[in-house]
Amino acid sequence: MRAVLDPNVLISAVLSSTGAPAQVLSHWRAGAFDLVVSDRLLDELGRALRYPKLRSRITPAEAADLVRLLQAAGVVALDPPEPPRRSPDPGDDYLIALAEAERALLVSGDQHLLGLAAAFPIRSAAQFLDLLRPEPAR
C-alpha cells in the first residue's frame, strides 16, 4: 500500500506521540506502507515546521531531521505539473494530484480534503489506521 501524508498529518505526528497521526508514522517506520513524498510536500512541511507557533514544540534541528528522514526513506515522486482545481483550497490540489499519479491514498486532517473522499481516495489518519490493522480472525 502507498500513501501520501498531508503535511498537517506529519506535523500532528510530531506534536503528539499518542494520536492517530503518530501511529500512522509508526506504521510507516515499521514498513506497513510506502510513504510517497515530493519536493513540494517536503518544502511545505519544512516551512510549516519553522512557523513561530511551532518553534517552542520542535527545534529547527528536529524539523530538518524529519524532512531528511522522509526524503531518504520515503518514495520520492515528481510533483505533477499544474494540478487541476479540485479542492476548495487550491494549495491542496497538488496533494490530490500526487496521490493519483502515484496510485496512493491521501491521508489528511484537512476537512476540505476529507470532504472530497467520495470522489478521491482520501482518508483521515484514524481511517487509514483501520485499513492498516488486520481484521480479527473469525
Task: List each model region and its residues.
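Residues that scaffold the ATP/ADP-binding catalytic core of kinase and kinase-like folds
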Residues: A13-V14, A48, R57, L116, ...
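PIN-domain endoribonuclease scaffold, especially VapC-family toxins
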Residues: H27-E82
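Active-site neighborhoods of divalent-metal-dependent phosphate/nucleic-acid chemistry enzymes
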Residues: Q71-L105, Q111
